[in-house]
């Protein structure tokens, strides 16, 4: 699912079909896609290269191409339709590396099909309640996050209502446990300036008897982690 490649386009198409099948409206009127483009350097293959007079200049100059990409965005309108909460995960990964000797495919089951499946399940759960959320919920699947989180950056920079977004919940690599001896262990990041995010999880664990042992990690800086960076540019509370 390398960004801009065939696998990534198929993944975007699949996610859009999942939203449609679940009955989740697209954020835009026409469809769930938010297309954008970016430049990237051509990947060079390993091997022997003939040395020409201008070889150094050519190598320094590099070869670029334009890639077409797309975020996938769905929404459930809330009782306060002009206030928003975003639930997101990136769906791209590293694709295929032909220079590798054995398995050349980066499958990306944990990074980040696990987060994508969580966002889809949350969207379905919202619909299953039959109730309107308090705020409008946007379900966002970001393209090209692995190399500069361009998908979420593009959304933030082009969103006309970004000042009305009240928070962002990010799901990334939730399919594995860094402490095998503690199967209920989970890492939970949140913005330090908004400790209520930590309090809410503690309350839910007690209320619903969730089998989780969170490792609470408060971020002192609003820029936070890799995939929350674009949202943090607008100083959104994040978890």
What would you call each of these model-derived segments?
Residues 142-239:
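Metal-dependent peptidase/peptidase-like ectodomains
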Residues 19, 25-26, 42-43, 65, ...:
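Solvent-exposed loop/turn segments at secondary-structure junctions
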Residues 1-75:
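A non-catalytic alpha/beta surface segment that caps or lines the substrate-entry region
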